[in-house]
Amino acid sequence: MAAPINQPSTTTQITQTGQTTTTTTVGSLGEHSVTTTGSGAAAQTSQTVTLIADHEMQEIASQDGSAVSFSAEHSFSTLPPETGSVGATAQSAQSAGLFSLSGRTQRRDSEISSSSDGSSISRTSSNASSGETSRAESSPDLGDLDSLSGSERAEGAEGPEGPGGLPESTIPHYDPTDKASILNFLKNPAVQQKMQTKGGHFVYVDEARSSFIFVRNGDWSTAESIKVSNAKTKENITKPADLEMCIAKFCVGYETIHSDWTGRVKPTMEERSGATGNYNHLMLSMKFKTAVVYGPWNAKESSSGYTPSAWRRGAKVETGPIWDDVGGLKGINWKTTPAPDFSFINETPGGGAHSTSHTGPGTPVGATVVPNVNVNLGGIKVDLGGINLGGITTNVTTEEGGGTNITSTKSTSTDDKVSITSTGSQSTIEEDTIQFDDPGQGEDDNAIPGTNTPPPPGPPPNLSSSRLLTISNASLNQVLQNVRQHLNTAYDSNGNSVSDLNQDLGQVVKNSENGVNFPTVILPKTTGDTDPSGQATGGVTEGGGHIRNIIQRNTQSTGQSEGATPTPQPTIAKIVTSLRKANVSSSSVLPQPQVATTITPQARTASTSTTSIGTGTESTSTTSTGTGTGSVSTQSTGVGTPTTTTRSTGTSATTTTSSASTQTPQAPLPSGTRHVATISLVRNAAGRSIVLQQGGRSQSFPIPPSGTGTQNMGAQLWAAASQVASTLGQVVNQAATAGSQPSSRRSSPTSPRRK
């Protein structure tokens, strides 16, 4: 027997401390390792430690009590041999676990045994005489199996019970040691029904005997019975699930093992040893995930209660991916050699076709001539309006000695009329026309044959959903909020509708869907609500009065006649009305000179401011109220007044805006407290509005958008704001001059304001 080509994995380390020499050997096998330590002479200790380590590793490998043995149970003789040691060999195979692995010479004398957590495979060959060997080499009688093939059935698919139809439930007996008996057993339809496949091989699982019949790659001549047993106890596998798992792993790894053994392992061993070794065992150890081929088992390895070594006495071979789950066995879809579903026989011989005198040259008497079949599938037409199938023609020509030509035509017209005509040399048969009516839904189709009935109307088109259902939930919620705000303005507390709104509900929904929301406000009247006498008629509370003077054009503050009637511009009138309807209170006029500053609108945020400057003042106070962010730069002229830049903050970013200042002529002004009143026009995503700020009070007035959405009112609004600011400055200056008199109510800047 040749030496193994894989040696144990051991590591030896020798250390010397003073006069003491310590030898340590570490051996590994899979996930297991053994460490042996000895002291003494280096050479002797090393040899002793190595032997002990090898023995321990072998003991570890022999502790695999769940290994399974596969052993072949048949001889290669077509008839049971009467001489030789076949019986003893077969009995030994059942207990020891052998299976054929390598290629055949005269007889497949190579053997495999597989030992693992689940499997050990073995097969033995017959030691019959040369005469029996020649009989074994003869081709077995496969019979119907020669044309039988199959493929793996899809998971969950229902296949035929067997190629022979519904089989009988009785399973016949077979001799596992006789190949002829196995082949006859496999010919039974009941057996074929129960056969399965894995890895391209066919298997029949005999759970009662803990064995299976293995047909390699569907080649029925390789059929053999394999016994499955525990490699340690040599007992049968009693659990069907475990038995199926072992068989499936064997089928998946068989071709890889066989190829590696015949192409690499065996030639290498023979080259190194110079002799042909009897390495006829294969052990599959799932515990260590290794496959090893080695020589015959000795008495200890063949005995019960001992698992053969998985590494020391053999050579490792590749197995492929069999160590993980490979799945179970699958069903088989059987296929046989296709046979014609119909046949054509000439029943009207012509000219003594069956007589010897009229037999054609080269045609034996009584010979059967295979018909030549032509099938034309062209011209198939389908009309959805009704049944309209084109003709299908089959021409069959049988030439028998040159005596007879027979043509059979089957045609299907658009009216479903079937005409079959058979023409021979002696007779013609015509069959009646068969009319088929196509029934409708609950009533007969009375349409005239041959006419094209218009197709029924199709289903109605799918109705598209409303636009609200096509927008996101966030947008829908915003639309509903905007609608709620509109309805709160459009109806008063009593549920009555309010007229003169800047937009209707449809416009609110449309703008909201586009991401824009304009507040709904009540439009002001077309004329200003002023009093000819110059007195406040309501809406503005009594107070300081300079805002009221601007709104009402008070003649007492401006020095005009008491009966003068103001003539405001239309845009001013709208602003005045909005202020009065908003019930803006006025503040007391301060006795001080004022300078009005107009800021030109730029980009999205601009403001119009009024700034008061005192003599010798070196600071400027500018207030801009809006929702945008930008730089507002103003410059005031006074004694020692520098340029001051301020910044207004809001919720959206805008570009930097510049301002142009319009100031009153410089003149000596009485010193006093400075005060600022600001009117700003603001544009943002919500719309436009006018913001009025006086001191610490501020009021915003939304500007309703135009009815059509196309008219640009920006120029008019800015002109109105500028006019208000200019007038405000003049009125404040005049009020300050008049307030310097001792008898005036507004003589003191510290006078308390009336609320």
Curated annotation (Swiss-Prot):
Residue spans of biased composition, Gly residues class: 536-545
Biased composition, class Acidic residues, residue ranges: 429-446
Regions of compositional bias (Low complexity) in chain numbering: 10-25, 35-44, 112-130, 139-151, 393-412, 600-666, 740-755
Region described as Disordered: spans on this chain: 1-44, 72-91, 99-174, 393-467, 523-545, 584-672, 734-755
Biased composition (Pro residues): 452-462
Polar residues bias (residue ranges): 590-599
Family: Belongs to the chlamydial CPn_0572/CT_456/TC_0741 family.
Protein name: Uncharacterized protein CPn_0572/CP_0177/CPj0572/CpB0594
UniProt organism field: Chlamydia pneumoniae (Chlamydophila pneumoniae)
